[in-house]
């Protein structure tokens, strides 16, 4: 999703691979996968970002990055 990252590709690829493997292990359909990932994002923001304004700004940035990643280039 991100065009630039402060994380190494190896670290990102390993984490992404693990998350995908879990969803595949549970044979989660698209809607269940999106629900679970959405809940994870919500929990990450609620547990790690102090103010509502910051959470909303990050959620908006995340949403925009997701939408941009779906555009055909």
Swiss-Prot record:
- Top-level taxon in the UniProt lineage: Bacteria
A Pfam family recorded for this sequence: DUF1414
Q: Which residues form a coiled coil?
A: none
The record's family statement is: Belongs to the UPF0352 family.
Report the protein name in the record.
UPF0352 protein APJL_0577
